[in-house]
Amino acid sequence: MTSKIFRYPASGVNRRRLLQGLAGGVAATGAMTLFGPAVRAAKPIKIGYVSPKSGPLAAFAEADDFVLGEFRKLVKDGIKIGAQSYQVEVVTKDSQSNPNRAAEVAKELITRDNVSIILVGATPETNNPVATQCELEQIPCISTVAPWQTNFIGRQANPGDPKSWKPFDYTFHYFWGLEDVIGVFTGMWQQVATNKSVGALFPNDADGNAWGDKVVGFPPVLAKEGYKLTDPGRFQNLTDDFSSQISAFRGADAEIVTGVIIPPDFTTFWNQSRQKGFKPKVVSVAKALLFPTSVLALGKSGNNISTEVWWTPSHPYKSSLSGVSAAELAKGYEQASGKQWTQPIGFVHSLFEVAVDAMKRAGDPTDGAALAKAIGATKLDTIVGPVVFGSDKVPPFAAKNIAKTPLVGGQWRLNGEKYDMVVTENKQAPQIPLGGDMQALS
C-alpha cells in the first residue's frame, strides 16, 4: 500500500518520562506535597479535541460548537471517579484541514496544555498525525470518522508489509472499514440496472490510496463481484480540472462513479461532468457527499446522489452520557443552529462518551497507561452504536486498537428547497430502518 504517512521524530525524552523524572527530583528534595493527593484532587481533567474548523474539511466540524457545548453542560459539576470528583476542561484546536498543523496542535495540547487524553474525528488527514503524536508521547488518543484501515494500516512503519504491522499502545480508533463501505455501495448499485462499469475518483491522500489499493481496497472486491473498474490514477486534492477523469469514464462507458474525495473537488468534478455531457446512472462517493450543504451546492443535479451513511436521527441508539436518542440529539442541533443535522454530530458526541467511560474505569484519569488500558477494554453502547475493542468483528492483528460501528447507505432526495437523506441499503445493519429504495440519477 502507498498510503501517505505522516511521521514526526520523537525527542529524546517524551512528556511522560519527563514528568516521571521531575517527580523523582521533587521527591529527592522532600517536596512530595507537590504531587500529593490534595493537589491532584483539585486539578481538573483536561481533554484535548482536534478538528478541522477551517479549510476544505471544515464541514466535518460544523456541529462541533453545539456538541462541545452540550458536553460542557453535562459535566459542569464535574465527574465522579472513584471517591473523587473531577472538574473537566475541554481544550480545542483547529487543524486547519492540514496534516502538519494537526500534528503541531496535538503537540501543543500535550506539552503546553497538559491534557490527559486527546479526541479527534475527521478524516485521516486529521486523525493520523494526531494519533502518531500521541503514540510517541504516550498520551491516550481516541479517534473516529475514517475507515479503520487508514488509521491502523496507514500509520504502520511499512503499510505494504502485513508481517511488520504492530498494535499501538496508546491510540484507539472506531468506525467502519473498507469492507463495509464496499458492501454498502455494491448493495446500492445492485438495486439499479447498470452495465457494471465503474469510474473511480481516488485522490493522492491516505483515503484515496487505501480505497484504490489493489490488495485491500476496492479493485479486488469489485472484480470478484463482476464490476469493471476504471481508475485513471491519483490526483491532488483541490484539483480544478477533471477532464482526464471524465474522458476516461466516458471511454469506459461508466454508468457508475465512486470514490472518496473532499467536498469542493466533487463539486468541481460534477459541474464539469454535466458540462461535458457525462451522466452516469449511479454516483456513490464517500466523504464529499456527507453533508446537506455539499449537496445543495450541486443544485437540482444532486438529486439521488448516494453516499455512505454512518449516523442519522433514525439510528436506534442513545447517549450513555445524557440518555438522549439520536433523534433528540439531531433535533437539538437543528433547533440551536437553524441548520440540518449532519452525520458527525453523533460521532463527535460518542468520542466524549467513550472518553468519560474509560476515565471512570481507569481509576486515575491522569495515569496515561491506566487510561489507555481502560480504553482498550471498552464495551459501551453509545449514540452511534456499540463500541467494543478486542471484538472478533475486526481482524486479529488490529482488534486491540480498532472497534467497528454499523454502516448503511443512502441517497439525497430533493425536498422543496432542501435535500433529505433517505437510507436505501441496510443489509449489513438491518437494525437501522430503510427509508426507501434506490433510484437512478435523472
Language-model regions, residue ranges each:
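Beta-alpha junction/loop-to-helix N-cap segments that form part of ligand/metal-binding clefts
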Residues: A59-F66, G78-N158, Y174, F235-F242, ...
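Hydrophobic alpha-helical
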Residues: P124-E135, D240-D241, S247-R250, A254-Q275, ...
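Extracytoplasmic ligand/sensor domains, especially the bilobed periplasmic-binding protein
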Residues: V115-G233, V282-T307
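Extracellular/periplasmic periplasmic-binding protein-like sensory domains
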Residues: W148, S273-H349, R361-A362, T424-P430, ...
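N-terminal secretory signal peptides
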Residues: M1-N14, G24-M32
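C-terminal segment of N-terminal export signals and the immediately downstream linker at the start
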Residues: S11-G12, T33-P52
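Extracytoplasmic "Venus flytrap"
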Residues: G48-F71, K93-P99, A122-T123, L201-G212, ...
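Segments of small-molecule ligand-sensing domains
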Residues: G332-I345, V356-V422
